[in-house]
Curated annotation (Swiss-Prot):
It comes from Drosophila melanogaster. GO terms for cellular component: nucleus. Pfam families: PAX. Residues 402-425 have a biased composition (Acidic residues). Central and peripheral nervous systems. GO terms for biological process: adult feeding behavior; antennal morphogenesis; cell differentiation; imaginal disc-derived leg morphogenesis; imaginal disc-derived wing morphogenesis; male courtship behavior; nervous system development; regulation of transcription by RNA polymerase II. Keywords: Developmental protein, Differentiation, DNA-binding, Neurogenesis, Nucleus, Paired box, Transcription, Transcription regulation. One of its GO terms (molecular function) is RNA polymerase II cis-regulatory region sequence-specific DNA binding. Residues 84-132 are annotated as: RED subdomain. Signal peptide: none annotated. Residues 323-332, 340-349 have a biased composition (Low complexity). Residues 172-185 have a biased composition (Pro residues). This is Paired box pox-neuro protein.
Length: 425
């Protein structure tokens, strides 16, 4: 009879089949040699069988008198769930459906149905109940103990007459849900550290910034939510600021050239490094002068330092957001706009042309031979004619003729400056 399994060779050179017992002929030979007084070590060398196998076979023969191999597959299972025990377990569960497995196990021991050594385990009782259809929960013993304690507490509270009969079938009712006001500890970090709604600006830029309505401090909580627009801890809205601080970015970009122009216009002393920022009084005076003069003049020319103003030089209007602090003109007259502005200028206003040139301006950079702007004659004629027509309408017109003593590059620069004034205005 061929044996199926993994064949191998032991240390003595004998062939064996792993997991299968020795043939009966080999077993009989081992027992016969042992009865003749041969030592087990000599038997193993003679029959090419390992010493452990010889010892095991001889030990079983001396104990039982049999040479048959033992059972394969481990120890024999203990049969504790007899039909009598199974019927008793099912009867106890039918009598009391709320009884747990550990209670059934105690009842089996108290009623002398099972001995302490043969009583089935809790898992065996649960398996019996599950197979019989009386147990559907997959609870462990610890969960059953916790549920039993909760059920006992609920029954004690019910018997004490704490309240009317509830509809939970003898089980503990769920704890009452109390809605507490939100606290900073319970609030998510995103909502807790979110900015107030007054400071949230539209990232897409579809709507302009509008002043938020002021809210009384009593309506604010200790924290602000991003979802509630009516809650704000502090009044940080744009309505608390002045209009000129909101819509005049030139007040924020107050450069050294503006301070120098202000000092020259008011006759005060100019300190180049003394004032690192604009004082509030000077900014307010500049804002009031801009509202009194009725507007600003935008051009790409340099700063005019010759014309003094009554309340200070005017700042350029930056509502459109297209002009930068480097391209601002502070040309202001006593009661009107700049000379290149339009026919609304008063006839008595005079404007001189002493300008402080910026070495980094476009005009100065265009003076270099490699970067000089080349204009064709047709475009130059068109610009000259348009500037002449507009300057004839104005009472005060800057001269467009180039004197003989001026350099052609300076004449071209003057022409470009006047053209830029006309185009911007």
């Amino acid at each position: 009879m061929p044996h199926t399994g993994q064949a191998g060779v032991n240390q003595l050179g004998g062939v064996f089949v792993n997991g299968r017992p020795l043939p009966d002929c080999v077993r009989r030979r081992i027992v016969d040699l042992a009865l003749c007084g041969v030592r087990p070590c000599d038997i193993s060398r003679q029959l090419l069988v390992s010493h452990g196998c010889v010892s095991k076979i001889l030990t079983r023969f001396y104990e039982t008198g049999s040479i048959r191999p033992g059972s394969i597959g481990g120890s024999k299972t203990k049969q504790v769930a007899t039909p009598t025990v199974v019927k008793k377990i099912i009867r106890l569960k039918e009598e009391n459906s709320g009884m747990f497995a550990w209670e059934i196990r105690e009842q089996l021991q108290q009623q002398r149905v099972c001995d302490p050594s043969s009583v089935p385990s809790i898992s065996s009782i649960n398996r019996i109940l599950r197979n019989s259809g009386l147990w559907t929960d997959e609870m462990t013993s610890s969960q059953q103990n916790a549920a039993a304690a909760a059920a006992a507490a609920a029954a004690a509270a019910h018997q004490a007459g704490s309240g009317p009969s509830n509809g939970y079938g003898g089980q503990a009712p769920p704890p009452p849900v109390t809605v507490a006001p939100p606290t900073p500890a319970a609030t998510p970090s995103i909502a807790r550290y979110a900015k107030p709604p007054a400071l949230m600006m539209n990232s897409a830029g579809e709507m302009p910034i509008k002043p938020a309505p002021k809210m009384p401090p009593s309506m604010g909580h200790g924290h602000s939510h991003g979802l509630n627009p009516n809650v704000s801890g502090l009044d940080l809205s744009y309505s608390a600021l002045h209009k000129h601080w909101l819509w005049n970015p030139s007040l924020l970009y107050y450069t050294q050239a503006h301070i120098q122009a202000q000092a020259a216009a008011s006759g005060g002393q100019f300190l180049p490094y003394a004032g690192g920022y604009l004082p509030h009084a000077m900014a307010a005076a500049a804002a009031s002068s801009t509202s009194a003069l009725g507007g600003f003049t935008k051009s790409e020319s340099s700063i005019d330092l010759s014309t003094p103003g009554a309340a200070g030089d005017a700042l350029s209007d930056c509502d459109s957001g297209k002009s930068s602090p480097a391209a601002l003109s502070l040309t202001a007259s006593g009661g009107g706009n700049g000379a290149g502005s339009a026919p609304e200028a008063s006839p008595g206003s005079t404007l001189s042309h002493s300008r402080k040139r910026n070495p980094y301006s476009i005009e100065e950079l265009l003076k270099k031979p490699e970067k000089r702007l080349r204009l064709d004659s047709n475009r130059l004629e068109c610009l000259e004619s348009s500037s002449c027509e507009s300057s004839q309408d104005s009472p005060v017109a800057p001269p467009l003729e180039t004197p003989e003593d001026e350099d052609p590059a300076e004449a071209e620069e003057e022409q470009e400056e006047e053209d830029s004034v006309e185009v911007v205005n």
